[in-house]
Each structure stands twice: as C-alpha cells, then as structure tokens.
Amino acid sequence: MDPGECTCMSGGICICGDNCKCTTCSCKTCRKSCCPCCPPGCAKCARGCICKGGSDKCSCCP
C-alpha cells in the first residue's frame, strides 16, 4: 500500500501503522504518525499539525 494513502477514513483501528503519512486519515492509531515531530506523550496532537523549529516542535503541543 502507498504510505500516502489510507484505507481507514472512519476512525478506529488502522493498518497504516507507523508509516501513515496521510493527512485525511481518521484512524486513532495513525494520529501521532501523521505528525512526526509531536512528542510521544502529547495527547493534543492532531492530524495535519505543523512542525516548526526544525521539525522538533509540534504546533499542537507545548
């Protein structure tokens, strides 16, 4: 499967795993993978967030 595509658009469990790069993915398990700069413990990370500061800080997390 192309890592840019995701078959899970309605939430729930997903087969994309850590390779999910899709911005329209609704899978709970893909949320962090779609924002690589988000710290592992951040619960506020959202899909489509912006990485700033050299991709080491997420716009959704403090």
From Swiss-Prot:
Q: Where does a divalent metal cation 3 bind?
A: 16, 20, 25, 30
Q: Does the keyword Metal-binding apply?
A: yes
Q: Where does a divalent metal cation 6 bind?
A: 38, 42, 45, 61
InterPro entries per the UniProt record, alphabetical: Metalthion_dom_sf, Metalthion_dom_sf_vert, Metalthion_vert, Metalthion_vert_metal_BS
Q: Does the keyword Zinc apply?
A: yes
Where does the chain bind a divalent metal cation 1?
6, 8, 22, 25
Which body tissues produce this protein? Expressed exclusively in stratified squamous epithelia associated with oral epithelia, esophagus, upper stomach, tail, footpads and neonatal skin.
**PROSITE patterns, from UniProt?**
METALLOTHIONEIN_VRT (PS00203)
Positions with a binding annotation for a divalent metal cation 2: 8, 14, 16, 27
Keywords carried by this UniProt record: Copper, Metal-binding, Metal-thiolate cluster, Zinc
Amino-acid positions noted as binding a divalent metal cation 5 in the UniProt annotation, renumbered to this chain: 35, 37-38, 51
Gene Ontology MF terms in the entry: metal ion binding
Task: Supply one GO BP term.
Answer: response to cadmium ion
**Protein residues bound to a divalent metal cation 7:** 51, 58, 60-61
* Binding-site residues, a divalent metal cation 4: 34-35, 45, 49
User: Belongs to which family?
Assistant: Belongs to the metallothionein superfamily. Type 1 family.
Give the protein's biological function: Seems to bind zinc and copper. Could play a special role in regulating zinc metabolism during the differentiation of stratified epithelia.
Its recorded name reads: Metallothionein-4
Protein species of origin: Mus musculus
**Gene that encodes the chain:** Mt4
